[in-house]
Regions:
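Bacterial N-terminal signal peptides
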Residues: 4-15
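Metal-centered catalytic cores of metalloenzymes
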Residues: 16-74, 78-149, 157
C-alpha cells in the first residue's frame, strides 16, 4: 500500500507523463517471454487500449492465439515495482481469444501506474497457471517504428 500511496502523491503533484488533454493510446505485445516467470509458449497476442480524455476509463481490445492449453482466467495487473513489491490484480478480463471492455481507473495510483509502464495483461492457462503470456501496456500504437519490427517478427512465426 505504501508504494500505491507514493504513486498517488506523485501523480497528484507532478501529474503522469503525457497527461495532456485528449484521449491517449496504449498497446501491449503479449507473449511468453514477458510472463512471470517467462516461458517458451508459442501463444501471442496484441492489445489496443484507449484512455479517455478524463483519464478515468481505459477501453481495451485484445486478441490472442495459439495457447498451449485452455485459458483459466486473465487480468490487468500492476507489477511489483508499482505496488509495494507485490503484483496485484486490478481488473479481470473476460475469457476467450478476443477481449473487449472498459477498465475503470478508480484510484490515482492506477493512472500513475499506466503512464509509468507498470500495468500488464496476464493470461493464465491450465499449463501455465502463473501466466502463459503477458505484455506491458506501453504508450502509442503498435505501428510506431519502435515496436513495428517486434510485431512483424511476432506475427511472422
Amino acid at each position: 500500500m505504501r508504494a500505491s500511496a507514493i504513486l498517488a502523491v506523485v501523480a497528484l503533484i507532478v501529474g503522469p507523463r503525457g497527461a495532456e488533454a485528449g484521449a491517449k493510446e496504449f498497446h501491449a505485445v503479449i507473449d511468453g517471454s514477458q510472463a512471470h516467470p517467462p516461458n517458451p509458449s508459442s501463444a501471442r497476442g496484441i492489445g489496443h487500449f484507449t484512455l479517455n480524455a478524463e483519464q478515468t476509463e481505459l477501453a481495451y481490445s485484445i486478441e490472442f492465439e495459439s495457447w498451449v492449453s485452455n485459458e483459466v482466467f486473465s487480468h490487468i495487473h500492476v507489477d511489483a515495482a508499482g505496488n509495494n513489491g507485490q503484483d496485484a490484480i486490478l481488473h479481470d478480463l473476460p475469457n476467450g481469444s478476443s477481449k473487449k471492455g472498459v477498465f475503470v481507473l478508480k484510484e490515482p495510483f492506477m493512472l500513475a501506474a499506466l503512464f509509468n509502464g507498470f500495468l500488464y495483461v496476464n493470461v493464465h492457462t491450465l499449463t501455465y497457471r502463473q501466466g502463459e503470456i503477458a505484455g506491458y501496456l506501453l504508450p502509442g500504437t503498435p505501428a510506431e517504428p519502435a515496436t513495428w519490427g517486434r510485431l512483424k517478427a511476432l506475427y511472422s512465426r
